[in-house]
Amino acid sequence: MGNIFGNLLKSLIGKKEMRILMVGLDAAGKTTILYKLKLGEIVTTIPTIGFNVETVEYKNISFTVWDVGGQDKIRPLWRHYFQNTQGLIFVVDSNDRERVNEAREELMRMLAEDELRDAVLLVFANKQDLPNAMNAAEITDKLGLHSLRHRNWYIQATCATSGDGLYEGLDWLANQLKNKK
């Protein structure tokens, strides 16, 4: 009985928290990713005008994920969510070749912000199930990720609807959090 109590206490005390900001251009799949992680299922989404926030429990870490709308008119509001962000998830529609430069500009603009200087960067190269999707290496090149010399970053190929790659991304974030201590 004491062992059960000890394990429970250890799990309660040992739980870590990580504040995650998930952004990207509109229709990249941010909300679908959030609810696939939270509920394990696909939900019908509409364009996010404000934000969605959910807590995702994974590997004894409580990820508080802020999913903020990506339409161009509301992107200036992203900066209001920067404070205390430990991890940034930037979601890219791997099939949207026409807007990948726009995605790069938005990402670089954000990464220049002082409030995000210590945040680690996880890029989800989403929609990998589509036949014309750019692979992770191509997205890495087009986003200029190799130029990020002083920031921990990782790119993960994902498919939000199937869940492929999502937990691998969370694994990387979890390891980053553990290494910060």
Swiss-Prot record:
Keyword field contains Transport: yes
Residues linked to a lipid group, N-myristoyl glycine type: 2
GO molecular function terms attached to this record: GTP binding; GTPase activity
Signal peptide: none
Pfam families noted in UniProt: Arf
Physiological role: GTP-binding protein that functions as an allosteric activator of the cholera toxin catalytic subunit, an ADP-ribosyltransferase. Involved in protein trafficking; may modulate vesicle budding and uncoating within the Golgi apparatus.
Family stated for the protein in its record: Belongs to the small GTPase superfamily. Arf family.
UniProt-listed GO biological process terms: intracellular protein transport; retrograde vesicle-mediated transport, Golgi to endoplasmic reticulum; vesicle-mediated transport
The entry's keywords: Cytoplasm, ER-Golgi transport, Golgi apparatus, GTP-binding, Lipoprotein, Myristate, Nucleotide-binding, Protein transport, Transport
InterPro entries xrefs: Arf1-5-like, P-loop_NTPase, Small_GTP-bd, Small_GTPase_ARF, Small_GTPase_ARF/SAR
NCBIfam families in alphabetical order: small_GTP
Name of the featured protein: ADP-ribosylation factor 3
PROSITE patterns on file: ARF
Quaternary structure and partners: Interacts with PRKCABP. Interacts with PI4KB and NCS1/FREQ at the Golgi complex.
Naturally occurring in which organism (per UniProt): Homo sapiens
Superkingdom of origin: Eukaryota
SUPFAM superfamilies, A to Z: P-loop containing nucleoside triphosphate hydrolases
Entry's localization field: Golgi apparatus; Cytoplasm, Perinuclear region
SMART domains found in the cross-reference section: ARF (SM00177), RAB (SM00175), SAR (SM00178)
GO annotation, cellular component aspect: cytoplasm; extracellular exosome; Golgi membrane; perinuclear region of cytoplasm; plasma membrane
Positions that bind GTP: 24-31, 67-71, 126-129
Organism classification: Eukaryota, Metazoa, Chordata, Craniata, Vertebrata
